[in-house]
Design a protein with these regions (language model features):
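Secondary-structure junction motif
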Residues: 7-9, 37-39, 51-72, 139-143, ...
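Hydrophobic hinge/microswitch elements
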Residues: 1, 7, 58-116
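Alpha-helical segments flanking ligand/cofactor-binding loops in enzyme cores
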Residues: 20, 45, 89-90
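Structural motif corresponding to alpha-helix initiation and N-cap regions
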Residues: 15-16, 40-41, 85
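A late-sequence structural motif
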Residues: 33, 39, 105, 115-157
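Short beta-strand-centered segments that line the small-molecule binding cleft or hinge
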Residues: 1-27, 31, 116-118
Length: 157
């Protein structure tokens, strides 16, 4: 494992690991083009009533949004959990599910799948995306090259 990319607040990495801030972002929702929810911004009740897809590398059915909904006494209908972002836009584009994800990633998905984007209808703080690695790899030229490439890519999304 060379690096881990993720939300620092979710990863909560040990203090001895190296980390680099990449960017801050907010959450957005994507649905297929023509989805009934895009005619107007959905209410919170409409949002939780529609089936959702969740991206979870661990398979957990509790995400950042679910934690906030629980505080509000609500629960969304998670119909499908996938372990990574790769298949998510293609599935959402062919179903009536909602996918909540970082806004910058949602914008990228819209370049290759027929999707519409809208804000998450709950108040969520912005989060920091970071890159984490073991300090033993800190001065490795190949590892430095990889980190530099990841940093450059993140600057452009």
């Amino acid at each position: 494992l060379d690096v881990v990319l993720g939300f620092e607040s979710v990863l909560n990495p040990p203090a001895h690991l190296q980390r680099q801030y990449l960017f801050s972002d907010s959450m957005a929702c994507v649905v297929r083009q023509g989805h009934p929810l895009i005619s107007k911004p959905p209410s919170l009740e409409e949002f939780v009533a529609v089936p959702h897809m969740l991206i979870s590398r661990t398979g957990s059915n509790i995400g950042i949004i679910d934690q906030k909904l629980t505080e509000l006494g609500l629960e969304r209908r998670i119909k499908l959990i996938v372990p990574h972002f790769l298949s998510a836009p293609l599935i959402v584009a062919k179903t009536d599910m909602i996918l909540s994800l970082p806004y910058r990633i949602a914008e990228q998905f819209m370049k290759f799948a027929p999707l519409s984007i809208f804000p998450v209808p709950i108040d969520l703080p912005e989060y920091d995306l970071c890159m984490i690695w073991h300090p033993l790899r800190d001065k490795d030229p190949a590892h430095q090259w990889l980190r530099d490439k990841i940093t450059a890519i993140c600057r452009n999304i």
